[in-house]
Amino acid sequence: TIEKSDLSYGYYFGCVLSNISCFESDLSNTIFSNGEINNFFIKKSNIFGTSFTNTMIKNLLCEDIMPGRWTTQLVNKHLGYRYTGVFKTLASIDDKPSRFEILIPLVQTLVRDNVKLNNDVYKELNKFMHDYDKTSSEMRKYLKSINECMLLIKNIVHQD
């Protein structure tokens, strides 16, 4: 268990990590590369810019990955900045279910905090929400949440 720790800018190459719970910690810009992660639970932790390059992920669970209250300005800055933002994290995850373990609580948090997204951030988020195989058996458990989130994100875009 990792609790209230600063692991930002860490680098884990070729590691096999199993049964890890991470609470109220900073994982921002941490790199997991050429390894394997089994049963990783992240709660109330910062994952902006965390990268899972060439890493096999089995059972990533995320809950409240944007702890605290988030303002429109803060979210658009941290979410949209491609090199350190959460989109870098999502793009590095090949495993679609793991992506949605991050996307779904992310959208729910944005709605909770009444955040309005910049248009470019909205388009990018929308692209990730649509990036799944509707016939995949492992995606079926996410479909209801994905559809709900896609409806919700239409309400959080800045109307230019």
State each model region's role.
Residues T1-D160:
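Intrinsic low-complexity/IDR segments
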